[in-house]
């Protein structure tokens, strides 16, 4: 090969090297979890990993998951989101409303996929369900009628119930306000009295159940990250205090809850890789519609 041709080849390789390097890089996905560890998020994280596997991804080879944990201290979401953005990651996954809001504050350019954010339009996470319009899209597991439907089913199963305690996470005010408004509107139609019961941290649960003992006829627990993580303890406390419990997750029925009504958590989290796969292949969050699971499952204690 002539010297001039060799120089051209070397120059061409040098120009192409950054593109080749980027092509060989493993995409990084940063996840903002609300719980404190992989063990606590085992079910949902497992669903995410299985979803990637089903799409042909192998963790560590052609996809890298970077998990961060807020340990139910939602102020940590801001720092965790900033840390992931600084790496940077290729996609952010935000679990719960506070995580989605923290991710939105952290970046306007990195694609964000939220899970379980309540009313993403009201929160101004997206412009619309069909066309989000920004760098954010995702899956909301909070159907508008879900809180009302839980009270309706609870009334059918426990017809003597008049006073219902509605647990709300005071550390998650956006969710709390929505749940209180929905439950009180539904209660009026069902001739129920709903009493909002604030829970700030998991450590409050024992005190809360001791306080409400014999003062209410049943307890309803909405979709919320902290309550999901504490679902077994909530069910056990309800059983110990002999209070009928309506909750969102079927696993709680096995340990003391009377009724569970809601969408499948594993199916919801299993859809997260679908969004990420689309984004990594060039789709924009602005054009990926928000999903709202339509199938809800009812489970009754035997």
Language-model region placement:
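Short hydrophobic alpha-helices and adjacent helix-cap/hinge residues
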Residues: 1-302
